Amino acid sequence: MIDEATPLLRVRGLTKRFQGRRGLEGHLAVDGVDFEIARGETLGLVGESGSGKSTTALCVLRLLEPTAGSVEFMGRDLTKLSSRELRGDRRHIQMVFQDPYASLDPRMNVGEAVAEPLRIHRIGTRSERRRQVAELLDLVGLRAGSAERYPHEFSGGQRQRIAIARAIALNPQLIVCDEPVTALDVSIQAQILNLLKDLQDRLGLSYLFIAHDLGVIRAVSDRVAVMQRGRIVETGRADEVLARPAHPYTRALLTAVPVPNVLEMRRRRSVWKEMRTLRASET
């Protein structure tokens, strides 16, 4: 039995080196990363493109094999599990990708896509899976009739809702969100972020939330870890780190506003204003 005080996920010394060609040294993408995620918590992992965020996530899931380090999830070190053992643990840890269209098989209708994890793990009869798909679609704000349609018939935001429905189908404990709103329109970003927060409250989910947009990280994270060149250079409560950054790289991220500055600031204000409005309308 796992103590509730034990972190859901504990990563220690996680390292990933990609081998170079013809005996060359290769690239150290993740360099001794440590972090923890508590039950029901969101850890925001932020950094520039190429900082190692997504590689870290893939190593946590063992979609990439770590070079060194440990990934303890629910008290078990995933790096030491066999493929068969890992398959069972993957029921409890899922991923939502940046591009919802690429993550959905265009040959499957929505019902088949959402039910696929249930079918793979042999959960329920066909009729039971259909009922569960309808419940999952309702949970993410889509009509049950959506199950018969195909991914290309939906907008980007709706496709991300479908991907989220599939991610929660197995009642996971942890969801890794890799830039889940980056490809979406501004108004839709706020809706998806609110959906993720609502699901967290309802289902007790934990998130490892990866983003390069500090505004997004500020809105969704309990704690934040700042990543630079494969290392975590600063970590702490999101409000404290983003209000009083200690590391020069974190300060640089906070002061770096893409051109054109005015348009970018307006865009960010629009997203967070809409998020506050949506949350207020639900209470």
Regions found by a protein language model. Give the residues of each.
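ABC transporter nucleotide-binding domains
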Residues: 1-256, 268-283
